[in-house]
Amino acid sequence: MQKNITKISDTEQELEIILSAEEFGTEYNQELEEAKRTVQIKGFRKGHVPAGMIKKLVGPAIEASIAEKMASKHFSAIADEENIKPASRAAIESFSFDDNQLSIKLSYEIHPEFELKGFEGYTFTQPRYTITDEDVQKEINLILKGHGTLISIDDAASATDTVIGDVVKLNAEGEAEEGSAMENHHFNLEYLPEENPFRSALTGKKAGEIADVTTEPKDEETPAQIYRITVKEVKRLELPELTDELVKEISGQRFEHAADFTSDVRLQLEQHFTMKSEDELLESISAKLIEENPVSAPKTMIASFANMLVENAKRQMGGNFPKGFDAGQFEQAMAPNAEKHARWLLISQKIAEINNLSVTDDDIRAFAEKEAEKNPTLSVEEAISTYMSTEFRDYITDSILKDKVYDIIKSQVTITEEPTPIPVRQN
């Protein structure tokens, strides 16, 4: 067997495999004999069609089948011998049977070879979110909203109130357009964007007052729209007191006392923002290493990440994109992000390779024990059994390896903490 490897690009190669008749003859003759037994031609008894006629009729199909078998048989061995790291399945570009030899040309993508820049001198800032009593109370208030009562008030509307009013659309002369009236329209100001003209105009208004609202045109050809709102009522959400009885109802009997519920809210906030802090640090690290190591990513790998991002978006929208959604344009918009994911995977793999990182059964058991601690309904034995299973093992192994890679990076860079207030939640 002869083999010739041609570099097409940093991520693409071609492999030519040349086999002698002795190396593919057995398989070829087996398929030819099978064809002799099964091919039927008028005028010949089954199994007695001349070999020359068989070759003329089904020879091309046999040759294609043999080329596929020989490519599958030899590619993996050659990849191991030549230290090729395929990033895609090898595809047959062409093949030929000449002078008792078979030549097969394969194309495939590879993981590129590159030198990883040292990152020991890098410095990163990690936000350290501080949870205040006010933050805890705001979170509790959000929970209590589902148990609150809307009450009518005489005060001017605040940015969190609901304004009820009659709406008409005005024409250029300032007169009401026929058929445009809407009675008792509810404006929940809290859920309107701050720059929304209706929110701006209605904040500060009382029952009986009038507000004129001008909306910005969508384009130069569309005129601005003017609406007149006669405020009929302003309502404010009155929150209930956080009592032990209400806590039992809200928590499904998990907590009996308001103090315990409040402590749990604080704990949940602390855990959430600890994870957020870590995620933001890791995002900064990956962005820096991607910037400093402009490695080319295989198209197959980028396409895989693009598909993952699209499927994630579909799940967030209930399983499918809404009618009229331009999926093609969305995929194009996701392409740069998919390429970053692919490049970061290559960099992570390089760090793991340099540091001889691997994942053992003991690592998976330790991971399962930590996860079981977080979930009281999951026993350690169940977690270990699940994570060791064929269905989950690769995913868990990948997660653990990522953590090991990040630990290596964090041990060699400088990380400074910056006290940071938690961001205001957008309703």
Curated annotation (Swiss-Prot):
Keywords: Cell cycle, Cell division, Chaperone, Cytoplasm, Isomerase, Rotamase
Localization per record: Cytoplasm
Enzyme class: isomerase
Domain of life: Bacteria
Keyword Hydrolase assigned: no
UniProt cross-references to InterPro entries, sorted A to Z: PPIase_dom_sf, Trig_fac, Trigger_fac_C, Trigger_fac_C_sf, Trigger_fac_ribosome-bd_bac, Trigger_fac_ribosome-bd_sf, Trigger_fact/SurA_dom_sf
Pfam families in UniProt: Trigger_C, Trigger_N
One GO CC annotation: cytoplasm
Protein name: Trigger factor
Organism: Chlorobium limicola (strain DSM 245 / NBRC 103803 / 6330)
Origin organism lineage: Bacteria, Pseudomonadati, Chlorobiota, Chlorobiia, Chlorobiales
